[in-house]
Amino acid sequence: MIMKILKIYKNEGIKGVMHRIRNRIHSQKETNIQKNNINEFYSFIENCVKDEKEEFNLENTNIIINWVLPPFGPGSGGHINIMRFINYLEKKGISNRVYLYARFGGETQESLKQFAIDYYDLNQNSNTEFYPHTDYMDYSHITIASSWESAYFVRSFGKTKHKVYFVQDFEPEFFPKSSSYFFAENTYKFGFVGITAGSWLSKKLSKDYKMECYDYGFSYDKELYKPLPKKNDGIVRIGLYARYHTPRRLFELYVLALNIFYKKCQKNNIKVEISFLGQDVSHINFPYPVNNLGTMKIKDIPKVCAENDIFLVPSGTNLSLVPLEVMACKTLAVSNRGENAEWLLNDENSILTDADPIDIAEKLYEVTINKEKREKIAEQGYNFAIKTSWEKSGEKVYKVIKNILEKKEEK
């Protein structure tokens, strides 16, 4: 049975496995089906409806922040961002504690901290405390939710003076217009102060949900992402940030666009090489050659970004950090238009397309055959990227936290 499942996964991916499981369940008699307990599954929502304020005294102590996070996993850009800010805030004298919002396995305080050091670039000598659950979460000046699920816990947590929402994407759009969509959307109405990844989210949450929001800008690791000489062998190299299991990264849309593009290149004897980076896609058949790079270690990604001439960085919701990382390597970034992207990208520093495979293919072909235009915009993208700074973003978040504490205390 296990070998059969692995074969299906290899050939059809997780969608194929889930399809088989659903069919198997539906074919069984009702008496043999283990009934789902919806209330138990969403108990974190039912049990987190009251804000039970408690009286406590944190005078004459350093600022303490509780961070409530989703479970850890390799390659999570959201966790990497949070650890980046924790590193900066710790330099400013702020004490940080990290809690997972629910029990997920056999994690210990020590294993979580080591994982954050190994995978999320937490400072090796950090004094940040890590806890595998929130059962005994202690008093703090500020408690920060970092996802819609964790927001429900923070809503009910009373041992804190202030509540903040560290928003990195518009999470309702991770779902169809379903119960989960509204569960996620409702968290923006909890009255938390928002700190958002970029101005698109800040404007959206302020306008649509009347949240008090502050945003920080993106940057990149300047020790890792640098230009390298491009190969001059007559082949134009194109990369795709390929996240098949992450719908908001528009994988299917760009796979179709690349097929249209590749056919046109073949017809006109244009030599191209296409690479996919982000997830293993060996189980998918493509009608054109693909260099499947899969999931790579952070230290190996910059070389791929720099060696490609063009990199496709699609996003249906908020941008990832990949566009800036690509631009920092003097590689031309191509993305789809939309307010979610154009708070950072524009026609001067990147190529923007409609979310249409034909338009993507046409614009991609244009910069493939026009080296001068490609290199000019890539240079402008590089000049834009190098002006960004995580230090500036860290200072901005630090000032927001100080202002929250000072402003609220005045009331």
Label the predicted regions.
Residues E325, R337-L352:
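Short acidic/histidine- and often glycine-rich active-site loop of Leloir-type glycosyltransferases
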Residues D347-I358, E366-K371:
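Conserved acidic donor-binding segment of nucleotide-sugar-dependent glycosyltransferases
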Residues N81, K204-P227, K231-N291, T295:
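Conserved catalytic-core segment of nucleotide-activated headgroup transferases in glycan assembly
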Residues A306-N318, T331:
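Acidic donor-binding loop of glycosyltransferase active sites
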Residues D359, E366, K373-K387, E395-K399, ...:
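A short, well-ordered alpha-helix in the C-terminal region of glycosyltransferases
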Residues Y131-Y139, K177-G194:
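Membrane-proximal helix-turn-helix segments that form the acceptor-binding/catalytic region
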Residues L332-N336:
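Short hydrophobic beta-strand element within catalytic cores of glycosyltransferases
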